[in-house]
Amino acid sequence: MESKLQIISGKYRGRKLALPPSARPTQNRARIALFNMLESGIIENTDKMVVWDAFAGSDAFGIECISRYNATAIFTDVAPESIATIRKNIAAISAENNAKIVQADAIGVIQQFARGANLVFVDAPYDTAEIGRAFVNKLGRTADSGTILVWEQESNNAVEPNTDTWEVLRDKTYGRAHFLILQKI
C-alpha cells in the first residue's frame, strides 16, 4: 500500500514519506492545521531553528520543519523500524546535513537534547498517555525558557500540562488528534 503521508509545504513539498509498519502518523489535514497555528505568530524566527521530534515514528513533523524552515532536526525513537524509516526518508530528500537520528528513549535523552531546541514535538503512543505526561514534565525542568512544545495526544485521553512550567498558547482537536502548543515559562 502506498503511503498517503507527504510533505505538505516548503522545498520538499509533495514528496511522499515512507512509513514504519507500526506507525500512527498525524494525518496531513491535522498537520496542515498544526503548522498554520505555529505560523500564525507562535514561530517567528525560523533561521537556524533546532527541532526535536522526540517520539519520531514516521518523522513527518521533523521533516516538515526541514522542508519549511532553515532547520536542523533531531529525531529520536526507540523502535529500530522507525529509525530505519527515518534514515530512508532523510536520504530520499538528501537532508543528512540537517538531521541527527538517534535510537533512544526520548525521556532518557532529555538532558542531551532539550537545551538548545527551539521547537519540540512529542507524540507519544496514544495508549500510553502517562509517557507523554512524564516527558513533558521532565522537559519542563530542563528546556530553555521560550521553548515551544507541540504535544499531540489522543483527543479522548488528553492530559493537561503543568501550567507552572508551561504557558498554553493553543489547545485544538482535529479528529483523534488533540494538539497543545505550549511555551516554556
Task: Show where each model-derived region lies.
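Conserved hydrophobic residues forming the short capping helix/wall of the S-adenosyl-L-methionine
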Residues: 38, 90, 94
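Conserved SAM-binding motif I beta-strand of class I
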Residues: 72-77
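Conserved SAM/SAH-binding beta-strand->alpha-helix loop
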Residues: 79-81
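Conserved SAM-binding loop
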Residues: 86-87
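Conserved SAM/SAH-binding loop
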Residues: 103-109
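S-adenosylmethionine
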Residues: 113-175
